[in-house]
Amino acid sequence: MKSYDIVIIGGGPAGLAAAVSAKKNGIESILILERDRELGGILNQCIHNGFGLHTFKEELTGPEYAGRFIKQAEELNIEYKLNTMVMDISEQKIVTAMNREEGLFEIRAKAVILAMGCRERSRGALSIPGYRPAGIFSAGTAQRLVNIEGYMPGREVVILGSGDIGLIMARRMTLEGAKVKVVAELMPYSGGLKRNIVQCLDDYGIPLKLSHTVVDIKGKERMEGITLAQVDGKGKPIPGTEEEYSCDTLLLSVGLIPENEISRGMGVDMNPVTSGPKVNESLETNIEGVFACGNVLHVHDLVDFVSEEAAIAGKNAAAYVKQGENRPSGGHEIVLNPIEGVRYTVPGTIDPARMDEELTVRFRVGGVYKNCYVSAYFGDERVIHRKRPVVAPGEMEELKFKKADLLKYPDLETITVKIEEA
């Protein structure tokens, strides 16, 4: 059985950044396992620009951004296996994988970094009534068909869901000559970035209907149209608000689900809100030596933040391997408590003794709040009180905590993060 210091599951933006970071932090024996035929993950089909503004201080396309990390990984002689599917990871960190060349094989790892990314929610999860004709795609599938395979899914398009992929595909389909008739969103707010609404919908005159959903799909062999209806505050269609749209294609951009089947199988504790692992300040799960980063941990808006997070996971995995049995025992653990508008925080716990000099805590809110404050309470004392003109679920928020500040509170058990009205 081959052994590696660090095995990384997934060769997308998170896996690549984690590998590069671990290598730069002194680990020589690293292996990336990727199930696709090339490294880069989802970025390979994201041919639009807007990537890299934070990481490289310039605007890149998805393949260009991935290419920079692939080049770094190859220059650092980081080993990787393509077309390789990981089947199982034991608590002892023995990775079982398979590919055509080697068949079923096992690898022993001192540390494992989970970077499997996420998948799209399908039509089945939505329970939309109607037939099952040809012409219904997830937005990511349509993106791959257009950008990589060179196929046009349809000519008259309706998009359900206003996640970033759906917004970007509204623009992409328009540029390819299709007529995008409407983007419908179940919630009273968009699920995507504000800049994507402006650049992908407003600039192309594509209407966005909030608090609307598809209540019927027409057509047997091929889609012929859909029925759209307004929904009430509980998401139930309002009778009498139905509108008919003729279309041959329905794209679904209705959320992303972190790919955590392997994580659950090995006993990683999961956060029910994010559907990703619970992690501490080192991005380490409840299983010692198993770290998580990127969209498998929680869904990100920008790949730059994925790379930043993955670099932290890679650095901490490297420290774990180098310290081995001499790893210092931690101090007391502080629990982050998201309430009143804050849905979750990553990380969920902080050990000040083990954290870096500064820690970024990322979170999402549960609704749109205008002229509000993002506040953090150390016990009963309000320490952070930051004014925000608007916060929305489609845009990730962050707070920064300094180690020196946390060490001033040796008995602190809970940090409460919440939204307060101005």
Residue ranges of each PLM-predicted region?
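Short, aromatic- and glycine-rich surface loops/edge beta-strands on solvent-exposed regions
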Residues: 374, 404-422
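Exposed aromatic-hydrophobic patches
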Residues: 362, 395-406
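A Rossmann-like FAD-binding core segment of flavoenzymes
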Residues: 68-90, 95-97, 174-261, 357-390
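FAD-site-proximal beta/loop scaffold in flavoenzymes
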Residues: 114, 136-146, 249-300
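Beta1-alpha1 glycine-rich phosphate/pyrophosphate-binding loop at the start
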Residues: 4-68, 72, 144, 153-199
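FAD-binding core/adjacent interface of flavoenzyme oxidoreductases
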Residues: 1-9, 67-156, 232-240, 251, ...
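Mid-to-C-terminal Rossmann-like scaffold of FAD/NAD(P)H-dependent oxidoreductases
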Residues: 304, 312, 316-386
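Predominantly flavin-linked oxidoreductase catalytic cores and closely associated redox partners
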Residues: 104-105, 111-208, 213-222, 289, ...
